[in-house]
């Protein structure tokens, strides 16, 4: 495409001069031009060449940007019990994995956690993104919910909602999350916090409900960091395995 554009410009540069002989070459044509006109023509051709080079450079840069924009992004968060948590509280560990196909795509995540009280089967636990990645005082130093748009809970980008615990474990794949790994509101470097209670989803009738859903004590947390796709691919295989096992049980 760029080559055709350049060729067209070159033809336009020489279009006003006709060849007296059908077999005359472009070199013969250049010899027939008077010195001043020849200099003007050569200068024009040189400018066209410069323009072609600039257009080509812009085209290549756009291609590089498209590759970057289309790049799949992954992140990982290794959940550990809060350093300030009393020993009689559940010791939650596990992984939260994120994948985003591009800056404009919706985020998806795997949540794989264990250590919840087994006797509290089918209980709901809230998980949120908090503003800071500061774990110096355990999960207590992660700050409030990450809320860059200053909207009420549960519209914060990291309000992941409630997760059902079964047999002391939590495993869930969620898609269409409003949080992002790219852009000015990316959650990279921020924290994911697992709470002791259920999120009331802003329906608790008090100020705390509109801030944090009255989700209770911060049991465990982690800091979101970029990663390769390896952990995500492993969880995807685990998900397929779980589906097969579930299908076998229902047949």
Swiss-Prot record:
Reaction catalysed by this enzyme: 2 superoxide + 2 H(+) = H2O2 + O2
UniProt GO cellular component terms: extracellular space; Golgi lumen
Signal peptide: 1-15
Keywords: Antioxidant, Copper, Disulfide bond, Glycoprotein, Golgi apparatus, Metal-binding, Oxidoreductase, Secreted, Signal, Zinc
InterPro entries per the UniProt record, alphabetical: SOD-like_Cu/Zn_dom_sf, SOD_Cu/Zn_/chaperone, SOD_Cu/Zn_BS, SOD_Cu_Zn_dom
Annotated EC: 1.15.1.1
GO molecular function, one term: superoxide dismutase activity
Positions of Zn(2+) binding: 145, 153, 156, 159
Cofactor needs: Cu cation; Zn(2+)
Major location category of this protein: secreted
Propeptide: 16-24
Amino-acid positions noted as binding Cu cation in the UniProt annotation, renumbered to this chain: 128, 130, 145, 195
One BP term from GO: response to hypoxia
Disulfide bond recorded as keyword: yes
Keyword Plastid found: no
Enzyme class, UniProt record, top EC level: oxidoreductase
Positions of the UniProt region annotated as Disordered: 230-251
CDD domains the record matches: Cu-Zn_Superoxide_Dismutase (cd00305)
Family: Belongs to the Cu-Zn superoxide dismutase family.
Described purpose of this protein according to its UniProt entry: Protect the extracellular space from toxic effect of reactive oxygen intermediates by converting superoxide radicals into hydrogen peroxide and oxygen.
Name this protein carries in UniProt: Extracellular superoxide dismutase [Cu-Zn]
Source organism (scientific name): Mus musculus (Mouse)
Originating gene: Sod3
